[in-house]
């Protein structure tokens, strides 16, 4: 990764949920591998308890204000407890010399806008797959879902520990399609694989149709082979610079005529990490989240880093 980005820290958002606990452990290990600071935060939103209707007595307004103050004070006290506990979890997941680089903080404001603004200033934001109060088996939590659509940099979404657990040598998987965000995904994936000392599986699924839907029967064998060769060369070109930069990473190239999402989901079942671009070859600048990245994140099968490129040119990537 770029020297400027590598020196930036990692922020993990917490809320006291089991997924949040797992996200803190993951973030602590990743920050240690990068040798950067880890900031544990919880955002406390404002409490609004205005009386119903347009007309109300001043005494009712005062009562509502008092309830708001009491409820907000309770939420702040609870947030400090959650951050303190998460800070301990981060310390336990890190080596003894990391204590000075791990901090905890309670912030105030709307949750998603606050974390989105923070994402401008850090290497990555880490969140749990589901937040407090989420039902088991539910889809992606509202905060995680919103942040992967609006953040100004990479966002890691961490599910509870997958079953069966992934072995330490499980590979990192990255989806490559030639788009700018998949280029950033390749950079992140090579860096993560190198730091973890594991292989990298680079998938290029180059059809928007399944293999049975593709009109292969209308192609002459030589034409089909030429098309496959072209796709394999494209993947090799996309990876060559990163392979030169990370010669220690063993790369397994997978090129298939298929839709990307099902193949990435298949590979995610045995991966310790999946890296995808926020939107692929069918996307456009400013697009929030593509169908492939959304499917992979929503599956909750493995930790996923969504590579997002800042829209503001003044913000470092």
UniProtKB/Swiss-Prot annotation:
Species: Mycobacterium tuberculosis (strain CDC 1551 / Oshkosh)
Q: Which residues bind ATP 1 per the record? A: 13, 128-134, 142-143
Induction text: A member of the dormancy regulon. Induced in response to reduced oxygen tension (hypoxia) and low levels of nitric oxide (NO).
| InterPro entries reported for this sequence | Rossmann-like_a/b/a_fold, Universal_stress_UspA, UspA
Question: Which superkingdom is the protein from?
Answer: Bacteria
A Pfam cross-reference name: Usp
Instruction: Tell me the keywords, alphabetical order.
Output: ATP-binding, Nucleotide-binding
Binding site residues for ATP 2: 175, 208, 277-283, 291-293
Report the family membership.
Belongs to the universal stress protein A family.
Its protein name is Universal stress protein MT2052
A GO term for molecular function: ATP binding
Cysteine pairs forming cystine bridges in this chain are none
């Amino acid at each position: 990764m770029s020297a400027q980005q590598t020196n930036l820290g990692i922020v993990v958002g917490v809320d006291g949920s089991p997924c949040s606990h797992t996200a803190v452990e993951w973030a602590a290990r990743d920050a240690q591998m990068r040798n950067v600071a880890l900031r544990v935060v919880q955002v406390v939103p404002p409490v609004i308890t205005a009386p119903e209707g347009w007309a109300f007595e001043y005494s009712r307004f005062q009562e509502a204000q008092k309830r708001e103050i009491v409820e907000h004070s309770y939420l702040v006290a609870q947030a400090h407890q959650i951050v303190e506990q998460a800070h301990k979890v981060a310390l336990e997941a890190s080596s003894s010399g990391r204590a000075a680089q791990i901090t905890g903080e309670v912030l105030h404001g709307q949750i998603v806008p606050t974390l989105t603004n923070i994402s401008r200033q850090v290497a990555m934001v880490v969140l749990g797959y589901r937040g407090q109060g989420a039902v088991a088996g539910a889809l992606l939590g509202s905060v995680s879902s919103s942040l992967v659509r609006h953040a100004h940099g990479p966002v890691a979404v961490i599910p509870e520990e997958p079953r069966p657990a992934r072995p330490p040598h499980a590979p990192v998987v990255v989806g490559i399609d030639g788009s700018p965000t998949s280029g950033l995904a390749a950079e992140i994936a090579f860096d993560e694989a190198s730091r973890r000392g594991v292989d990298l599986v680079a998938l290029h699924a180059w059809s928007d149709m399944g293999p049975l839907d593709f009109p292969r029967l209308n192609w002459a064998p030589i034409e089909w082979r030429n098309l496959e060769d072209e796709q394999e060369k494209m993947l090799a070109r996309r990876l060559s610079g990163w392979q030169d930069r990370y010669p220690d990473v063993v790369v397994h190239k997978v090129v298939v005529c298929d839709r990307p999402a099902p193949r990435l989901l298949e590979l995610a079942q045995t991966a310790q990490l999946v890296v995808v671009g926020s939107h692929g070859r069918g996307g456009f600048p400013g697009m929030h989240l593509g169908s492939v990245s959304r499917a992979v994140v929503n599956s909750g099968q493995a930790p996923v880093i969504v590579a997002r490129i800042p829209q503001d040119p003044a913000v470092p990537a």
